[in-house]
Amino acid sequence: MSQTTATLPLPSPESAIALAGSGEDNLTYLAHHTGAKLILRGQELMVVGTEKAVARVMAVLQSLAPYWQSAKAISRPDLMTAFHALDTGKQEEHQALQKTVLAKTRRGEIVRAKTFRQRQYIKAIQKHDVTFCIGPAGTGKTFLAAVLAVQALLNNECDRLILTRPAVEAGEKLGFLPGDLQQKVDPFLRPLYDALYEFIEPEKIPDLMERGKIEVAPLAYMRGRTLTNAFVIVDEAQNTTPAQLKMVLTRLGFGSKMIVTGDITQTDLPNYQKSGLQVAQTILKDVEGVAFCYLNQADVVRHPLVQRIVEAYERSENTSPPAPKPSS
């Protein structure tokens, strides 16, 4: 079969590094999925292969041009999404995805939806007062909600930001734990703090909390309140009981938005206890003003090394013989 060659000039050494990835992982991935050979020499990428293979590589790289042209690292999910767009004829939508900027982190990093489903999730939050997002860890459920919440707070679109999750590991019996309230709930709410730190200087957060602009508390502390002009994020909702989730949903006041996130495959509730998130899917699926979004493994955004570690463990689990049963 005849071979063809195409070259892609890169604007800077940093662009070449961003495109190639750590250890040229991105080039290896492109080669594996197209059959083409990719050779990076300085600020020029050479692609060799069949006409179809070369065309696929060039189309994917052109769709990701906003990344490597600005020397922003390209991740495995970025490549997966670009291939999916190419194979499904959604290249224009994918290019629009790259141009949509949600926010910038404190370090100046651009935050945008990585996948089509993430973009649908963002649109749902913007359009609805209550949005459920269900999917596995690492899909950006809480992070994207926090991005929109912080932007709303900084742009004075809401009066306060409320982050809550069930402290199921402590059975919500926080009175049995040593320390004051803040010391008791911090370990359970740390993932929410991590999202805040991406956008707000850590030293400013205590002042915002003191002024009531940011509240981070376990779910039990929402009882009996009406949350008006607030942006509320309910995290780890798979660990709520139906009664708990109903309680927090009915706290919603005028001018507020609520995002409920969780992974229904990873509940810490006792086996006999139904998850409030699962029940809500059935009860609220047709309620006007409520949206349900579903993310899956294709939306997982991981550090490339973490991805390789996960894949290595999966290969080991698939090939290892079952452990022997203990003798009776």
UniProtKB/Swiss-Prot annotation:
GO terms for molecular function: ATP binding. The keyword Cell membrane does not apply. InterPro entries: P-loop_NTPase, PhoH, PhoH2-like. The keyword rRNA processing does not apply. One of its GO terms (cellular component) is cytosol. Transmembrane segments: none annotated. Keywords: ATP-binding, Cytoplasm, Nucleotide-binding. ATP binds at residues 135-142. It is found in: Cytoplasm. SUPFAM superfamilies: P-loop containing nucleoside triphosphate hydrolases. Belongs to the PhoH family. This is PhoH-like protein. It comes from Synechocystis sp. (strain ATCC 27184 / PCC 6803 / Kazusa).
